Amino acid sequence: MKKYIKIARLDHWIKQFFIMPGVAVALLLTEHSLTDISLLNLFFGFFGTCFIASANYVINEWLDAPFDKYHPVKKNRPVVTENMQLKWVLVEYAIFIVFGLLFSYLVNKLFLYTSIVLLVMGIIYNVKPIRSKDIVYFDVISESINNMLRLLMGWFIVTSDSIPPSSILLGYWMAGAYLMATKRFAEYRMIGDPSTAGLYRKSFVRYTEKKLLASSIFYALASTFCLGVFLVKYRIEYLLCIPFIFLLFAYYSAMSLDNDSAAQKPEKLYKEKKLMFLVLLIIVLFIICTFCNFDFLKPLTSSALIKLEV
């Protein structure tokens, strides 16, 4: 039983906290307040997302087993090393789906629909004939859509009357793509041998360190541009947070260059003290900029030229 629980990656449930920015954005942009949030909706929403994610992890572990044996760490996964049966893996997959969709239904219909899309994306990513994880660049783009879906799920916990602005949706999607490309880059460097890397992950046959690094820079630029549009459009005070967001991206990129980089395991990033300090600093700045007005920034919202007195 323990090995079947392990492939559900319960330790990865911490990543489902990526729904919380969706909650925060909904509170910022709609008429709802913190007291309007149903704790039951928050509970069902969070754990519904966790169950759907675990369903995707289960099929990921099973279908990746023939390739994981070439990875220096993943070769020790239960599906690779132990005699696990497909029928019980499918039963586990079905159980997580049932509970995930049930909990999602208890939030609202839009949350349920988004959960179904999250489930479908897991199939597209892992299951042939598409199996997008084997397709260069599309592997990152398709997997990181889940980041945008989590933002939507957080939003729908608060309100089902609207959807978030496209700028924050695209920015969050591209931030996920940046994290995934950086993870690929760190993983490729850690394996150290292109031929072995290609056996482990088919997309690595066409990737190189240069391509992965360049793509991560592209996603970072796309993300920060979209996030910048959102921040400046809805509250000019958020402009003060942007340099620290740039710093966060730069620091994370530097982390990916470390030997056996922590960027390979996003679920363990909470152990990176400097990174968490930066994240906490940005959160505090966002809170300050939400409740404080800085009049000296107001002229920046005007399209008029700044006049000089000679």
What is each residue range found by the language model?
Residues 48-80, 132-142, 178-190, 250-251:
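Acidic (Asp/Glu-rich) catalytic motifs at the cytosolic membrane interface
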